[in-house]
């Protein structure tokens, strides 16, 4: 399995000097560089145009931290990122095999499930086109959360602790993925109450176990949510851009065409997803209730990514936080891989035939992956947000153009955008360009002839920020200036 995951990784990242892609890769490179000094403080001034972005307060990083370790070792952002993606793919295929075996009860089916899940179109898009590495990590954790929730609710296993640990890992990975997973677990809980047929004893057990899991999750994730909420309580924080859900949802036809072409520049389920929607229809009559629910979940999670669902009805609800309905395809990856694994189990019986089928499936996945990569190389250069990450432009992308430059910035600071961009200092009422020196966890401005005047620095101020004048701590007044 590790070899298969390695071949999958090498196929897309063959050059350790250059990455040609799009999406959020510059943002995540800046995160790696910024996190390299996390033990000196949560703010790093060498990234995000030296503004002192508080991204680490609002964007969890625990599961992304191995990339930082690789950066410490290699001192190369590109190499550290490629190594991390390789590690992520290996961990994904191994974990999916482990939990697939727990759920499917057959080694061959678990093997197929882990391969399908790793190679799935939408997961590949998340990693190699969108460069949405946090969401890709979340796709590794979500099946674990769902398994323990299922085991606790339907198999009546005492899984409160592993459910809390896996949910905590998800929170430490990506908040929006956590939000969607909470909804999914909520639907499982609702189904559990329906199945229990209002039996009081079972309902009480379920409530107690879930309460334990929730309580432990809150405690385990306090390291992330406490500083974040303190920042929000102190001042207004600029949120990432909001979107119109109906507009961002996919056309059904575009989704199908993009999937059949396994086109990574579209946000679709890919060819494996198409097979997961069609192939199970030939086995549907032989499915048991659980298998039918999984198949219907695969279909529904795909439909929810399209304009088939009236997303405009949810625009003014908390659901709008997901920004893009096609993010729900992360669950289609899980349900689609599971139902195809059940199809494999039902269509394969003889031991010799199993080996042949598994070998053929793996070779086909590798061949399709190679063809997809070749097609992507031609299409990505035509994308509006295409960029080439190499040593020549790393500083420019991680410092000046990382993406999300003003995400999570204090709202009050946005009125000074022009002066921020020019790194101007206000002395009294006049703005001036002053020399400054940037270090990992601090920035030093040299300001002359300012005695008795208020100074406004082009730096974001968060709860916990310390300002010093000539080595002495000074009061920060109204979050904009230093006395």
Language-model features: where?
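Membrane-interface helix-loop-helix junctions at transmembrane boundaries of multi-pass membrane enzymes
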Residues: 108, 197-210, 278-302, 351-352
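Perimembrane helix-loop-helix junctions
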Residues: 181-216
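Active-site-proximal, structured, solvent-exposed surfaces of multi-pass membrane proteins
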Residues: 414-483
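Active-site lumenal/periplasmic loops and adjacent helix-entry segments of GT-C-fold
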Residues: 5-141, 148, 176
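Periplasmic/ER-lumenal interhelical loops and adjacent helix-loop junctions
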Residues: 206-210, 214-283, 393-407
